C-alpha cells in the first residue's frame, strides 16, 4: 500500500489516539483529520477543530454531520488554542500546514501564527501526548 501524507498521519493517529482522548485538530480544513479523531476518541472523547476560513469550518461541520460525529468546530486561529483548553490536558494535537484544497490560494498557514501554535499545542499536551505535523507546499 502506497502512503501519501494524509494516510501516513492517519496511520500514526490510529496507533496513538485511544478511546476517551482529548484531541485538537489545529488546521481543520475539509475535516478529514477531525473526523478521524472523533472516531478514534469515541463518545467518551473530545475533539476541538480550528480554522480561520468560514469555508473550511462549513466543510468540516458538513463532513461531521454526514458521519454523525461530534466536535467543537471553532472559527479562530490555531494560535489561540490555549483559550479553549487547559495546559497538559490534551492527548493529541494535529497540524496540516498548507492551504485549503480548492480554497483561496492567497490564504494559507503562515509561520508567524504556526510557530506560536506549535508552542501552544506543546503546552497543552499531557505528558506522553503526541503531536503530528504535516507540511504541504505549493
Place the predicted regions along the sequence by residue.
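Conserved SAM-binding motif I beta-strand of class I
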Residues: 46-51
Amino acid at each position: 500500500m502506497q502512503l501519501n501524507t494524509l494516510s501516513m498521519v492517519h496511520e500514526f493517529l490510529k496507533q496513538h489516539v485511544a478511546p476517551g482522548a482529548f484531541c485538537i485538530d489545529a488546521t481543520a480544513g475539509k475535516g478529514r483529520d477531525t473526523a478521524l479523531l472523533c472516531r478514534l476518541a469515541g463518545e467518551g472523547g473530545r475533539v476541538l477543530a480550528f480554522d480561520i476560513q468560514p469555508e473550511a469550518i462549513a466543510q468540516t461541520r458538513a463532513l461531521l454531520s454526514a458521519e454523525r460525529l461530534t466536535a467543537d468546530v471553532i472559527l479562530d486561529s490555531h494560535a489561540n488554542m490555549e483559550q479553549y483548553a487547559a495546559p497538559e490536558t490534551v492527548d493529541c494535537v494535529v497540524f496540516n500546514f498548507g492551504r485549503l484544497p480548492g480554497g483561496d490560494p492567497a490564504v494559507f498557514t503562515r509561520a508567524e501564527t504556526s510557530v506560536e501554535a506549535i508552542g501552544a499545542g506543546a503546552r497543552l499536551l499531557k505528558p506522553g501526548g503526541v503531536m503530528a505535523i504535516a507540511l504541504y507546499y505549493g
